[in-house]
């Protein structure tokens, strides 16, 4: 696997969290192999929606295809072609759940990041930068810094964002309350008027895309309310 893998660990975003890299270090295998194998001709990173793909870093473990098919029940991606030319197909029925990224052991599937663009904006004195955080972030981001799961780091998070250069930090909690109230009113209206039930939340774009792609007959069930971020 390593002999056919690009020697780009120093510039790969997955470096430090790559299972192939960790396994190579554990077994004492060097990237400077005496007998290097052929590299994939698909050595090009490109964006597919919110996903960055680089087929040359794929080790064809098929975790992504198995998870998509067996766990998510979507089956949007699969292995195509044969032999060394085998690649994982693009997910034309993809619902943007992101689980393929989570299970990918290398840098073949990564989430697209706007960090470089944000850094430019933060250093531009003419740009007034605003950040808005979802309620879940305050109790989940701490895990990435070695804290216990569920630790509330609201104060630390706001301080860090201000130090980064954001001029204002807003909380989505207020609009989340608005969403709940609007959805409650809509549910009461549906119950009284004999509308379509059950009423399903419309806050998650991945969920709505799943309905549009796989269950278009259920598009009259989601609430008409916008997500807290949109409100």
Where are these regions (language model features)?
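Fe-S ferredoxin-like electron-transfer domains
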Residues: 1-96, 102, 106-128
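Iron-sulfur-associated redox domains of electron-transfer enzymes in respiratory
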Residues: 111-231
């Amino acid at each position: 696997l390593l002999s056919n893998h690009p020697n780009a660990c120093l510039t790969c975003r997955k470096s430090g969290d790559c299972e192939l890299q960790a396994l190579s270090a554990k077994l004492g295998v060097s990237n400077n192999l005496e007998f290097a194998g052929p590299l994939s001709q698909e050595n090009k990173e490109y964006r597919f929606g919110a996903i960055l793909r680089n087929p040359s870093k794929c080790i064809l473990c098929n975790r992504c295809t198995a998870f998509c098919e067996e766990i998510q029940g979507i089956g949007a991606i699969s292995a195509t072609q044969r032999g060394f030319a085998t690649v994982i197909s693009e997910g034309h029925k993809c619902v943007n759940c992101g689980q393929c990224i989570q299970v990918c052991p290398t840098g073949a599937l990564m989430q697209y990041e706007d960090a470089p663009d944000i850094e430019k904006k933060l250093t531009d004195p003419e740009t007034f930068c605003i950040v808005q955080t979802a309620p879940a972030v305050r109790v989940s981001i701490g895990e990435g810094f070695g804290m216990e799961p569920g630790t509330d780091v609201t104060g630390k998070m706001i301080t860090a964002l201000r130090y980064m250069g954001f001029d204002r930090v807003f909380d989505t909690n207020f609009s989340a309350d608005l969403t709940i109230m609007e959805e409650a009113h809509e549910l009461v209206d549906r119950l009284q008027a004999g509308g379509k039930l059950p009423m399903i939340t419309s806050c998650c774009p991945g969920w709505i895309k799943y309905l549009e792609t796989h269950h278009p007959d259920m598009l009259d069930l989601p609430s008409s309310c916008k997500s807290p971020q949109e409100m």
